[in-house]
């Protein structure tokens, strides 16, 4: 009797679960990076499936810059309580002591100190030798050339010219002492795949992904949400209430919203079928300088 043919989403799911299980078996101290966004939510769902009915055998790590949306932090804590996974959080204490913030220090310095350096501190503190991330190849050109097993040196730096071939989905996890890998189980997924899988599996998401009336400021052609009293208005700016949603999430002063009426999953998927723009157009950190994402990754970014 012929086996049942898997659908496109089932094939992606099976591939991701196999990668997660392989890393859990092969590495001594893996961790899953949890940014609280839609891709992290899908990756968490896949990890739960991979080890069901047991618990996820590694912790989740959130590098908290102190500038995430309030709804993201509330959602993070609710998910940890609901599913009972081990949640680690880390904030760069040196950055906090220096008062680093995206308004006074700019996106490049804020991202480097609070995200990149904060991540490296946490990885060193706990001695993780493999870190799962939710990046996808369709997101951005530097991520398009990254391997599923992305090797990092003892300083967590990425050298795109010094990576291993992954023929026939065979992964080489051998690392020298002090080295590590970043693992991307969602590498072959697209943004549309993610949304269709969320719909199929009924995965919970931060409400910010759905259209609602929110307080925003128009700055440089982008809509920035005034999430708390720390929002610094520039001359001539006023806060307006408009119906918007977020296609991608990060630190609130560095993440732009978009006008949208998509307040449920069906409408978001319909919107995705029609859009021709990149989901990362709302991430202000990507416009710091030419090839900024690749430079950040070379320095140890997610």
UniProtKB/Swiss-Prot annotation:
<dbReference type="GO" id="GO:0004781">
    <property type="term" value="F:sulfate adenylyltransferase (ATP) activity"/>
</dbReference>
<dbReference type="InterPro" id="IPR014729">
    <property type="entry name" value="Rossmann-like_a/b/a_fold"/>
</dbReference>
<dbReference type="InterPro" id="IPR050128">
    <property type="entry name" value="Sulfate_adenylyltrnsfr_sub2"/>
</dbReference>
<dbReference type="InterPro" id="IPR011784">
    <property type="entry name" value="SO4_adenylTrfase_ssu"/>
</dbReference>
<comment type="function">
    <text>With CysN forms the ATP sulfurylase (ATPS) that catalyzes the adenylation of sulfate producing adenosine 5'-phosphosulfate (APS) and diphosphate, the first enzymatic step in sulfur assimilation pathway. APS synthesis involves the formation of a high-energy phosphoric-sulfuric acid anhydride bond driven by GTP hydrolysis by CysN coupled to ATP hydrolysis by CysD.</text>
</comment>
<comment type="similarity">
    <text>Belongs to the PAPS reductase family. CysD subfamily.</text>
</comment>
<dbReference type="InterPro" id="IPR002500">
    <property type="entry name" value="PAPS_reduct_dom"/>
</dbReference>
<dbReference type="GO" id="GO:0070814">
    <property type="term" value="P:hydrogen sulfide biosynthetic process"/>
</dbReference>
<keyword id="KW-0547">Nucleotide-binding</keyword>
<dbReference type="GO" id="GO:0000103">
    <property type="term" value="P:sulfate assimilation"/>
</dbReference>
<keyword id="KW-0808">Transferase</keyword>
<protein>
    <recommendedName>
        <fullName>Sulfate adenylyltransferase subunit 2</fullName>
        <ecNumber>2.7.7.4</ecNumber>
    </recommendedName>
</protein>
<comment type="subunit">
    <text>Heterodimer composed of CysD, the smaller subunit, and CysN.</text>
</comment>
<dbReference type="GO" id="GO:0005524">
    <property type="term" value="F:ATP binding"/>
</dbReference>
<comment type="pathway">
    <text>Sulfur metabolism; hydrogen sulfide biosynthesis; sulfite from sulfate: step 1/3.</text>
</comment>
<keyword id="KW-0548">Nucleotidyltransferase</keyword>
<feature type="region of interest" description="Disordered">
    <location>
        <begin position="280"/>
        <end position="302"/>
    </location>
</feature>
<dbReference type="Pfam" id="PF01507">
    <property type="entry name" value="PAPS_reduct"/>
</dbReference>
<keyword id="KW-0067">ATP-binding</keyword>
């Amino acid at each position: 009797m012929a086996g049942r043919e898997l659908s496109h989403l089932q094939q992606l799911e099976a591939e991701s679960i196999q990668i997660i299980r392989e890393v859990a078996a092969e590495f001594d101290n893996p961790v899953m990076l949890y940014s609280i966004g839609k891709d992290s939510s899908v990756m968490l769902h896949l990890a739960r499936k991979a080890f069901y009915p047991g618990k996820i055998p590694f912790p989740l790590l959130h590098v908290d810059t102190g500038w995430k949306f309030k709804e993201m932090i509330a959602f993070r804590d609710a998910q940890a309580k609901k599913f009972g996974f081990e949640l680690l959080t880390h904030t760069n204490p040196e950055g906090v002591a220096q008062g680093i913030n995206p308004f006074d220090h700019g996106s490049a310095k804020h991202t480097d100190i609070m995200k990149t350096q904060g991540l490296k501190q946490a990885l060193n503190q706990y001695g993780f030798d493999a870190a799962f991330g939710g990046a996808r190849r369709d997101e951005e050109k530097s991520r398009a050339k990254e391997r599923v097993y992305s090797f990092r040196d003892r300083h967590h730096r990425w050298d795109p010219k010094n990576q291993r071939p992954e023929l026939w989905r065979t992964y080489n996890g051998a690392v020298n002492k002090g080295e590590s890998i970043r693992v991307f189980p969602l590498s072959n997924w697209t943004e549309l795949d993610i949304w269709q899988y969320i719909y199929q599996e009924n995965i919970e998401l931060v409400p910010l992904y759905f259209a609602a009336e929110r307080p925003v400021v128009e700055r440089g052609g982008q809509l920035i949400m005034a999430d708390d009293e720390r929002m610094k208005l520039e001359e001539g700016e006023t806060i307006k209430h408009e119906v918007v949603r977020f296609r991608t999430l990060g630190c609130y002063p560095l993440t732009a919203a978009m006008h949208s009426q998509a307040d449920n999953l069906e409408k978001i998927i319909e919107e995705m079928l029609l859009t021709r723009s990149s989901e990362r157009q709302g991430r202000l950190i990507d416009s710091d300088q030419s090839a900024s994402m690749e430079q950040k990754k070379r320095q140890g970014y997610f």
